[in-house]
């Protein structure tokens, strides 16, 4: 397919999508440290989106559940565990013992990550509104 075969409206929509994604992620100089961490590679970004989806759906997120959120084709089990543990060490994700079993770990976003993510969602929505004006 050649670009000349794509209608003008579709080209404009595609360019708007690219602009929105880049300006609210990797090209955003004001990105907080937490979002930069999760936007460093595809796996981390996929993990962030899946993790926040589950959290916002009020699902309990155990270690096994957290590392199963992203398909295996994106990262090995070791990489998935490393990213989770690194996010905990950096203070982006909070780890606590389960009320049911002491050995079971439960995860939730820290206040920092939650605030950064909500602001990120707001800026993405704001970008869409600005483009519509």
Predicted regions mapped to residue ranges:
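N-terminal leader/capping segments at the start of a protein or of a new domain
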Residues: 1-26, 132-133
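Short alpha-helical segments that sit at the start of domains
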Residues: 20-53
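Alpha-helix N-cap/helix-initiation sites
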Residues: 37-44, 59-60, 77, 81
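Short amphipathic alpha-helical interaction segments
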Residues: 74-89
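A short, conserved structural fragment
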Residues: 88-98
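Short, amphipathic alpha-helical interaction segments positioned at domain boundaries
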Residues: 111-133
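Short, Lys/Arg-rich nucleic-acid/phosphate-binding segment
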Residues: 97-106
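Short acidic, hydrophobic short linear motifs in intrinsically disordered regions
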Residues: 57-71
């Amino acid at each position: 397919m050649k670009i000349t075969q794509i209608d003008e409206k579709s080209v404009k929509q595609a360019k708007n999508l690219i602009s929105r994604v880049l300006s609210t992620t990797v090209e955003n100089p004001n990105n907080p440290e937490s979002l930069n961490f999760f936007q460093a590679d595809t796996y981390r970004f996929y993990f962030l989106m899946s993790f926040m989806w589950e959290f916002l759906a009020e699902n309990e997120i155990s270690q096994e559940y957290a590392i199963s959120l992203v398909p295996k084709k994106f990262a090995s089990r070791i990489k998935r565990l490393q990213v989770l543990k690194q996010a905990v060490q950096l203070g982006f994700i909070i780890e606590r013992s389960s009320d049911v079993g002491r050995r079971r770990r439960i995860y939730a976003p820290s206040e920092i990550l939650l605030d950064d993510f909500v602001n990120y969602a707001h800026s993405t929505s704001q970008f869409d509104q600005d483009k519509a004006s």
